[in-house]
Curated annotation (Swiss-Prot):
PANTHER family: 50S/60S RIBOSOMAL PROTEIN L16, LARGE RIBOSOMAL SUBUNIT PROTEIN UL16M. HAMAP family: Ribosomal_uL16. Keywords: Ribonucleoprotein, Ribosomal protein, RNA-binding, rRNA-binding, tRNA-binding. Signal peptide: none annotated. CDD domains: Ribosomal_L16_L10e. GO terms for molecular function: rRNA binding; structural constituent of ribosome; tRNA binding. The lineage of its organism: Bacteria, Pseudomonadati, Pseudomonadota, Alphaproteobacteria, Hyphomonadales. This is Large ribosomal subunit protein uL16. Part of the 50S ribosomal subunit. Belongs to the universal ribosomal protein uL16 family. Gene3D superfamilies: Ribosomal protein L10e/L16. GO terms for cellular component: cytosolic large ribosomal subunit. GO terms for biological process: translation. Binds 23S rRNA and is also seen to make contacts with the A and possibly P site tRNAs.
Amino acid sequence: MLQPKRTKFRKAFKGQINGQSKGGFTLSFGQFGLKALEPERVTARQIEATRRAITREMKRQGKVWIRVFPDVPVTAKPIEVRMGKGKGGVDRWVARVAPGRILFEIDGVPEDIARQALALGAAKLPIKTKVVKRIEGI
């Protein structure tokens, strides 16, 4: 599971995801990518499940790049605990994903396999996505 090795602070505010992605909206490595169309917090488990689905469909050919990293801690209190008494412990790690953000990139496989793999991966995510292709010469 992805998570930071160390952080400046143990716990974070909930925060908001406003507007379009300020960076990471172009393909940097592969020929095909999976682009987010909605704002959402994506957990480390969802990222890993997506990576596995994509890799399995590609039959371990080609290369996969994960372009998001879960660096925000989400806290939760134990079950049946009364309100108050401080903030709960870190429960999971999430990545804040804004619309337009490239989540995954792949290369080294034919277009039909790439689109199928990314579609299977997209089914593991809680947001609407679309498959994008690199345009040469721009």
